[in-house]
């Protein structure tokens, strides 16, 4: 498997205890608020260190490495753009040690591919939700990551923009040939994007497989979690 995580982390009364694997595909991690999904991504990215266990990427143990040496692109839920920097400088932030001409080429090429070349001189405050998401994606991808982590990347956009951005996320995976681990509580995102789906409840990965398979899961908690969201999915289709 391309990514393997077997690790534990305690934060106050919360305990993350994960055994997770994924290949070079698009994996969506589903779970309710408070399940530990964001902490899990931060552990993979190196922002949070495990108390025990390891993170392996393409066979190599990256647990001791700092975030900037892991080769992982990370888009946090709030996008974490620097408000005082232009779009250009936000995208270029991870290329501080790259020679200037090469840095400029990569920033402009990435902006062109994601349709934000006309925004390079703007500050984040002047961007729409969809534009901010594209800038955050560009910043994560410009470092040429081996893995892309997305934490609730569509939670701050309206439904129309969400549909467009879901198509763009699939384009990103194909265009850049990068495995993606996408965290959400939204079953529609999983249905539209995922090659595989994992379910996290109370800090543990409790099921993993194709989405259709998970609807017949024998785990009662998983069945309850998915059935409630499946009802919402059917209702949303009726309303559309």
UniProtKB/Swiss-Prot annotation:
PROSITE patterns: ABC_TRANSPORTER_1, ABC_TRANSPORTER_2. It is a peripheral membrane protein. Its EC number is 7.3.2.6. Keywords: ATP-binding, Cell membrane, Membrane, Molybdenum, Nucleotide-binding, Translocase, Transport. GO terms for cellular component: plasma membrane. It catalyses: tungstate(in) + ATP + H2O = tungstate(out) + ADP + phosphate + H(+). GO terms for molecular function: ABC-type tungstate transporter activity; ATP binding; ATP hydrolysis activity. It is found in: Cell membrane. Pfam families: ABC_tran. Gene3D superfamilies: P-loop containing nucleotide triphosphate hydrolases. InterPro entries: AAA+_ATPase, ABC_SmlMolc_Importer, ABC_transporter-like_ATP-bd, ABC_transporter-like_CS, P-loop_NTPase. The keyword Translocase applies. The complex is composed of two ATP-binding proteins (WtpC), two transmembrane proteins (WtpB) and a solute-binding protein (WtpA). Belongs to the ABC transporter superfamily. Sulfate/tungstate importer (TC 3.A.1.6) family. This is Molybdate/tungstate import ATP-binding protein WtpC. It comes from Archaeoglobus fulgidus (strain ATCC 49558 / DSM 4304 / JCM 9628 / NBRC 100126 / VC-16). The lineage of its organism: Archaea, Methanobacteriati, Methanobacteriota, Archaeoglobi, Archaeoglobales.
